Amino acid sequence: VEDIQFRVIPKLQQAFGEIHLLDLSENYDFAAVRVGLQSFNSDFRGFVFNDINLGARVFGNWGNNRYQYNIAGFDMREKDTNSELNSFDDRGQEVMVANFFWQDFLWKGYTAQWSFLANLDHGGTHYDQNGNLVRPGPIGTVREHDVHAYYLGWAGDGHIGRVNVTHAFYEVFGHDDFNGLAGQPVDINAQMAALEVSYDRDWVRYKGSFYYASGDHNPEDGTATGFDTILDNPNFSGGPFSYWARQGFNLGGTSVNLKQRNSLVPNLRS
């Protein structure tokens, strides 16, 4: 008789409470706060931070829903190795987000967004449930390090006349107190840009997509110019139906990936 093994791993993926703070007008403008394990997407397409995690969020709108805002902070949980669900363990990483949306900005049907994100990553040494070292990433000089990265972004989504437009631009700056490839502390200065334009004619949609993330031509100097996200999951240029976005590509059997699953950015993370 073959042995049958059972494994029970309790997880709580999403659970939150929401309080309605006040009404701002008779047109359903409001302010509210939500606390707990909750989903959050920092922009229209999930370019920088798109996750379900433990946090608190104040959000609302005014001006007949023309203006909307979010102010949120997340105390990130570790992910289960095999299911990728949230565990109850603290990851040692805090993420803060503030963004503002303006509907019908310049053109009717076009919504603009401005964002600020802070990634304060103090995660120490961590092995996954399969015994692999995943933090710090085993590439270059392997040593615990803290990363403070700050993102400024402008994004937009909607249509200008009959042309559908989605775009985003992010500048990230900050400091890594020990970069494994450089073997020294580095300052962060990197950029990302995305543009998707489409046009509908009868039953056909003609679409073109462009995505750019800056690289680092000299990873051993004191400036890190390669763009990386906090935890992206972009719905762009095919999103989860794109082979490049859906798959993570491993480097030579190590726990380091050229890029992560559900990401567009090559980042050498584990």
Residue ranges and their predicted role:
Residues 5-7, 144-145, 258-259:
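Short Gly/Pro-enriched turn/cap motifs at secondary-structure boundaries
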Residues 15, 27-33, 38-224, 266-270:
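Signature for the C-terminal beta-barrel architecture of outer-membrane proteins
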Residues 7-12, 53:
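Generic alpha-helix structural propensity
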Residues 20-27:
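Alpha-helix termini
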Residues 12, 16-18:
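Gram-negative (and chloroplast) outer-membrane scaffold detector with strong preference
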Residues 215-270:
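C-terminal structural cap/anchor segments
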Residues 4-9, 27:
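Extended ligand-binding groove/face enriched in aromatic
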